[in-house]
Each structure stands twice: as C-alpha cells, then as structure tokens.
Amino acid sequence: PCVFMDDDGQAYIYNGGGGICKGGKLKDNMMELDGEMKVMEGLVDFHEATWIHKYKGKYYLSYSDNHNDDWNDGVEGDNRMHYAISDSPLGPWKHMGVYMDPTDSATNHGSIVEYKGQWYAFYHNSALSHHDWLRSICVDKLYYNEDGTIRMVEQRK
C-alpha cells in the first residue's frame, strides 16, 4: 500500500493488484478508513506498485504496468512505470504515459519524492545480483516539463 498525506493534513491510502487500483481516505487515527475504498478511474494498463505525490497543485499517481502477456516469465522488460494526473487525490485520473522504461528486473516498483528542491525517482533493478528476482535499489533524478508532464527518467547503472 501507499499512504499519501495531503497539504491539508488529510491522509489517503492506496493499494492495487490484478489490474485494479483503489484509494480511500483515512481517519485521523491512521488505522481506519473514513468511508469506502474506491476504484481509481482513468488508469491505463495498471498492474501494481501505486505511488502518489503532489507537484504544483496536481496529484500524480504512478504505477507499474502489465504490458507483456508473459509478465512473470523473468524476461527483461516486463514492467514500465506509468503516471496519471488529477485535480483530486481520489481521481478521476488522466493517463499521461510512461516515465520509465523497463529495468532488467522481472518487475518494477517506484516512488517519486522531492529532496532539497530536486525530484527523484526511486525504483529497482537486478544490476548487483544479476538475478531478476533479487532487487537492487536505484535512484535517479526526475524532471518535469513546463506543462507538468514528467520527462522519461534516464536510468543509470
């Protein structure tokens, strides 16, 4: 799951798998839902690995896709990272495309965070182990275009 804390102090929780992403509000105790979880509408080829962040007043939902029919076969290039944008933390979402190509791992999960004015994309690959099921943590700089779209992340090995 992913927990996102909005600027107004409201917490949201997201989870997903099997092609469905859901999100909902959390109560102040951070232990209970404040209402029902709802399906996040507008995502394209969602698989798993939901992450939410906010940039210039817009909400960004990033996730791993399932574009390969043999997605769990251990072949390089099984999952790309997509993102969608919304005016609300619970959507509806507008799919914007892919911001990261597949790694050499059988899957990819990512997060996007700002640190000291620079945005970063965290993800994993198999560069250290050379086995697609053993994940190595990676981080690269992430950049936005003037219109708020995310540039493709250049993966450095």
What does each of the following model-derived ranges do?
Residues P1-K157:
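Carbohydrate-active catalytic/glycan-binding domains of CAZyme proteins
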